[in-house]
């Protein structure tokens, strides 16, 4: 009998997102800050993404580091975000962090909510 282990696909923290986080943390003057990405119920498609800066990291959080800054995800949110890409975009709609999520079956027009 063989036992298979599950290794989730990591979250991709793009260069653009890391650079913007670094800039925002520098402007805030608090090097302990990390970008926390989370999923909550709501939005027009059932779930929505959230972003906040946080100094605290829980023992079971997933941490992705790039360019000397950290992206943090709690375990409940990670199950919806495994394999996703966190990026920062500037365009006609303004500047914002965006998530390209391969787990999302549908997304709303603004890209901030999704269903699985």
From Swiss-Prot:
GO terms for biological process: iron-sulfur cluster assembly. SUPFAM superfamilies: HesB-like domain (SSF89360). One of its GO terms (cellular component) is cytosol. Its cofactor is iron-sulfur cluster. Transmembrane segments: none annotated. The keyword Chloroplast does not apply. Keywords: Iron, Iron-sulfur, Metal-binding. GO terms for molecular function: 2 iron, 2 sulfur cluster binding; 4 iron, 4 sulfur cluster binding; iron ion binding. Iron-sulfur cluster binds at residues 44, 108, 110. Signal peptide: none annotated. Pfam families: Fe-S_biosyn (PF01521). Binds 1 iron-sulfur cluster per subunit. HAMAP family: Fe_S_insert_ErpA. Required for insertion of 4Fe-4S clusters for at least IspG. Homodimer. This is Iron-sulfur cluster insertion protein ErpA. It comes from Azotobacter vinelandii (strain DJ / ATCC BAA-1303).
